[in-house]
Amino acid sequence: MKKVYKLVHKRFIEFSADTNEKAYCTKLLGFFSSKQKCRDMINCYLQKPGFKDFPNDFQEEIVHADTDDFNGSIGEFRGSVFYLAHEYFDGEYDNVSDLGYYSTYENAEKSLSEYRENPEFINYPDGFSIDEYEIDKPEWTEGFFTF
């Protein structure tokens, strides 16, 4: 498949008047092969603590295999998504950048080497990660609480 549906729960937590930026708590819930499977998972999550208190914070995004800032060719997912991200802590918040979604670990590694040279990430060279997610397998199995 050339595309999958990425499901996240992105809850607003704070606004900084100093920087005029919003902070969110974002949970990656999984990658799904169809819009219907994504919607079915939302219904399951709505039964869990935390999620049912913030029912409007679910977001679906279509992601294509092997496309990023360096590659425009669409590949084929084969049961897994290899997710390339960059994360660093600025002293107050974790900052996460979604860099790409790949059909193979090797394709993700190739793009990672390109991103390492990007001035935006050069000060945090250890912040890169490549994680494998099985398509149609929920990644978050419990609810959550807020305080």
List where the protein language model places each region.
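Short aromatic-glycine-(Arg/Gly/Cys) micro-motifs in beta-strand/loop hairpins
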Residues: 1-28, 70-98
